From Swiss-Prot:
Organism encoding this protein: Bacillus thuringiensis subsp. konkukian (strain 97-27)
Binding site residues for L-citrulline: Y86, N122, R126, S174, S183, E259, Y271
Annotated HAMAP family: Arg_succ_synth_type1
Ligand binding (L-aspartate): T118, N122, D123
Protein name: Argininosuccinate synthase
Amino acid sequence: MDKKKVVLAYSGGLDTSVAIKWLQEKNYDIIALCLDLGEGKDLAFVKEKALSVGAIKSYMIDVQEEFANEYALMAMQAHTLYEGKYPLVSALSRPLIAKKLVEIAEQEGATAVAHGCTGKGNDQVRFEVSIQALNPYLEVIAPVREWKWSREEEIAYAKENNVPIPINLDSPFSIDQNLWGRSNECGILEDPWAAPPEDAYEMTLALEDTPNKPEFVEIGFEAGVPTTLNGTAYPLSELIKTLNALAGKHGVGRIDHVENRLVGIKSREVYECPAAMTLITAHKELEDLTLVKEVAHFKPMIEQKITELIYNGLWFSPLKQALHAFLQETQKNVTGMVRVKLFKGHAIVEGRKSEYSLYDEKLATYTAQDEFNHDAAVGFISLFGLPTKVYSQVNQKKVEA
């Protein structure tokens, strides 16, 4: 019987390495796909490892700039903070991984794609809904969800089949990282009362170890896109990396969160998102300067829905595409400079300016240079309060009667 081809999202870890052998037993030829999302792994090694374990072909694709410009940028412009805290680090990368899985599957003539998600996480939903949206005819295989092995059983299978066991396997943590940040769960973090140990963090310093003097960064934006740091122009992926280092040194972006997962359980997660939190903070302040009141007040409702759609794996849904169009329209005049103080875990905006600023000092000032028409206030108040006044008059008459 001819073997079918499957494209596997490959990380180099134990689960996806074992999945190669498991899929071989199911009569598949495995094509491994590893993406460089800015996590800092030795991906050349990961690519070769897939071949050594048994994949017939292995791809390593650098998608950092695509991830920055088409995924992280939208998240920043929409100020996506799930449940007010989590900037969607992992959720943002899943639709891009799904997109590349589908592209390689179509290119290679594969009939299926596979991922290494468990049956109790959000990522299985994000991958599979995205894949269905992009190519509903591809079979999706989830080996880890299907085999239901304990960790001990999985290690035993790996040893029996000569699958290399990672040297960091004894680490209690489950970590996912990309340009936009780092997520960490499992181990002691499963106890919501336990303080995260310092070795749970990598991108940020503890407050006790951060500099005792603040550092200032000036972030330049053009039409809602961060383009410069302290006067130096960067591609967006490099700007994010540079800001991760700057803000992380000051302990910015540590998040300890008990979140409501899509699959119905609560999960305690620890995140590090120094650049994401700094950029979201700065961008929001520039919007406050440049957006008209009606748009500024309406946009958070759209942001909330976009955040939910991305978290729930609906990146490729029609509603998300429609809301993205609204978001892009709001960014046309979000151009300017924001000065941010990085100090002891905080990113504090201390200045903002824009050629499209709607702040008029002559109207806002209380000095002799005031140009606001105070006489207009009387008529405005009369008309603005008229519905309330009429309602009160009518109901007071009923009480008196």
